[in-house]
Amino acid sequence: MKNQFAVLLVALVLLQLFSQSEAFWSTLLSIGKSLLGKRGLRNFDLEQMDDTYEPELSEADLRYLQDLLR
């Protein structure tokens, strides 16, 4: 009985691992298709990346980045 329970637990863990990795890869594949497709490249907005870049950095920001990268 203990062996059957252990086999069941291992099977459930492996099933969860497979299903989660399948969802991850399918999401990654759909993102790649949307970016590389004809419509995806035409509708890709480069201005949405502007929020991640701040051209004006203060001295405190530069010092913090230098300390962070050491």
Curated annotation (Swiss-Prot):
Keyword Transport listed? The answer is no
Which compartments is it annotated to reside in? Secreted; Target cell membrane
Cysteine pairs bridged by disulfides in the record:
none
List Leucine amide occurrences by residue.
36
Tissues where this protein is expressed? Expressed by the venom gland.
Tell me a GO cellular component: extracellular region
Name it: Antimicrobial peptide VpCT1
Native species of this protein? Mesomexovis punctatus (Scorpion)
Extent of the signal sequence: 1-23
Similarity comment text for this entry: Belongs to the non-disulfide-bridged peptide (NDBP) superfamily. Short antimicrobial peptide (group 4) family.
Q: Which UniProt keywords apply?
A: Amidation, Antibiotic, Antimicrobial, Cleavage on pair of basic residues, Cytolysis, Fungicide, Membrane, Secreted, Signal, Target cell membrane, Target membrane
Function statement: Antimicrobial peptide with potent activity against bacteria S.aureus (MIC=4.7 uM) and E.coli (MIC=31.5 uM), and pathogenic yeasts C.albicans (MIC=25 uM) and C.glabrata (MIC=12.5 uM). Is not very effective against P.aeruginosa (MIC=150 and >300 uM). Also provokes moderate hemolysis on human erythrocytes (HC(50)=10.5 uM).
Q: What Gene Ontology biological process does one annotation of this record name?
A: killing of cells of another organism
Task: Give the propeptide positions.
Answer: 37-70
